[in-house]
Every structure is written in C-alpha cells, then in structure tokens.
Amino acid sequence: KMYEELSPETREFFDFMMEGDLFDVFARPHKQVGGYMTYLPDYHAPFIFANFNGTAGDVDVVTHECGHAFQGYISGKDPIMEHSDITMETAETHSMSMEFFTNPWMEQFFGSRAGDFLKSQLEDAVVFIPYGSMVDEFQHRIYDNPELTPDERKAVWKELEQIYKPHQDYGALAFYAKGCYWQRQHHIYSYPFYYIDYVI
C-alpha cells in the first residue's frame, strides 16, 4: 500500500518487483548476511536481497534498498545501459531519500508506535552526519599520508573523534578507546571513499 500511494511510478515499480519475485528478504538458515540491491541488466530488473528478522531494521532496509531499486527500475528503461549506471556520488541519494519519503506510511508498520520510530530515525540521521563525515576525513588523512604507522592511524582517529564525536565514551572497551573503532567500518576496507555518499 505504501508504494501504491506514494506515486503512480512507485506503484508500477513495486508491482513489477512483486510480480517478478525480485525480493529475497526473509532470513533462513545458512543464508548469506547483508542487504543490498543489484540490477540484472539482462532482465531489466532490480533485485533486493536482505535478511529480515522482525525488527524495525527491516523497514529501514526495505525502504533504503527500494530507493536503490526504484532508481534502477526507472533508469533501466533507457536502452543505453551506460545511462543507468549512476555515479557513486549519487547512488545513496535515492536510497537515503526513500527512507524519509515513506515516513507518512510508518503507522502501517508500527501502529501507535510510529512516532517512536520516526523519532529514532531522525536521531540516527542527525548522529550519522558527523560520523559519516569523520569516516571520510579519516580516509583522506590516511591516504594522503600512507607512511603513517598503525599507532599514528589510531591517533588520527582519536583526534577526529574529539572533533566529530566529543561525547564518545568507550568505557571499558579499551580496544576502541585507543583509536581502533574505525576498524569496524567495513566500507573503509571494501569501498574506500564511498561512505560520505550516505551523508550527502
């Protein structure tokens, strides 16, 4: 109902996805972890993969990945395949926007607790902006100074935490307290310089 009411284009898109069985979103034993959208050019179709577990995170994932998929569905109609291949700088614009475009329908998922979800979503977005910016600045500093030792890299992270997240207190988590929290961010390893795109 949400995508049906959002716009005629999203209704057409979601019907296409459902009719084509283009979602694999329910968790099952031995299923690969993660959530993503990929485009299947031979079929002119987006495909969404996820692992729903009955939490509010499922709504975050489906709205986010449907943002990617809707972009793929719309641009995939162009007969020149290269036109549908968007840049890294714009890829997350569609997905992050869709998370907020669908807010008027959150009562369908959360009933009387929709306000709690929306408040949490806004808090997460506000907290994420400095964190995403910090990850990006960290990468620039590291790549601009490849000779930095592991301890110097940790010192850079700690310095940036004082700027972007001065409230951060790791308590007894000594590993993170000595500047190692960045190692949790797989984008730094797998997709360098992509993280700022979630903030744009």
Where are these regions (language model features)?
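Cation-handling catalytic/transport regions enriched in His/Asp/Glu
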Residues: 1-200
